[in-house]
Amino acid sequence: MSDSQNINRSGMSRRQFLAGTGALGALGLSLPALLAACGGGDGGGAQSLFFENWPLYIDPTEGDTLGTVDRFIKATDIKMTYTEAYNDNNEYFAKIQPLLGAGKKIEPDIIAPTFWLAGRLLALGWLEKLNLDKIPNAANLVPGMQNPTWDPTGEYSLPWQAGMTGIAYNIDVTGRELKSTEDLFDPAFKGKIGMLTEMRDTIGLIMMNLGKDPSTVASFDDASGAFDKLEKAKSDGQVRAFTGNDYTDDLVSGNFAACVGWSGDVLQLQKDSPQVRFVIPEEGGTRWADVMVIPKGAKNTDAAAEWMNFVYDPAQAAQLSAYVQYLSPVSGVQ
């Protein structure tokens, strides 16, 4: 981050907070509670589909085993384009705002923002209603997944995956296991720490490290201590970079000894990079969900509905979840 890139105190946005070291184990037993907190077009042209998503968020085709996109194409004959277009929510919003704000279409038929950004897009009138009649497999969702508080009718969004934010680290660089958010401020790792530009993730962890409860924040003044600690770490050279989803390369290479990271990303990286670890800090971590929505004016809303229905089939959801290592919203697929 350059000096001109000041820490964004208005960006506490992506996650919900998960307190306590027992939360990681408990989370798999309380998935409905996690996911419930998260809560068109002309309908024609169902011969093609364009989905923009986050990196490391779908299973690819490997050898004779078809990935989700190729299975969908084979099952439906719909031509599908899938791209990894996100690095962080604010960056993606800045990308789509000029067109949607001018009443113009953007290219993708489906996007997968985190729930807070989806709520913002809905409030701005930039989303199409879903044709739920064409998504009968939505009945397979974990109870409470439809009708989140920001989409009370449940007509504009459906869940993609959920996960956790904690500390990712490269044990070959740290030389020890990490347990606390305070480890990010250890002088031994000066210049080798990564922080997420998603400030709710980063500041949430630091607040819990300071003994504060982020869920009770009423104003940014309540988080001032955490921002001050982060800004001091930046000015002291403790922080190497503020990143979005691209933290993974620096983590694997050892440019980062440790960073704020997302659970499924790290679990995937471990397949080829066993030196990479993930831990929910003893002070607490955060939990979140990303959702599928259809941007205003999308051409292929029927194909979008067909995709959503496909990924909510339990067999399809299981294969997807087994690869991405995030929490599936489909009942029985955890």
Task: Specify the residue positions occupied by each region the protein language model found.
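A structural signal for short loop-to-beta-strand junctions that line the ligand-binding cleft
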Residues: 104-113, 128-167, 192
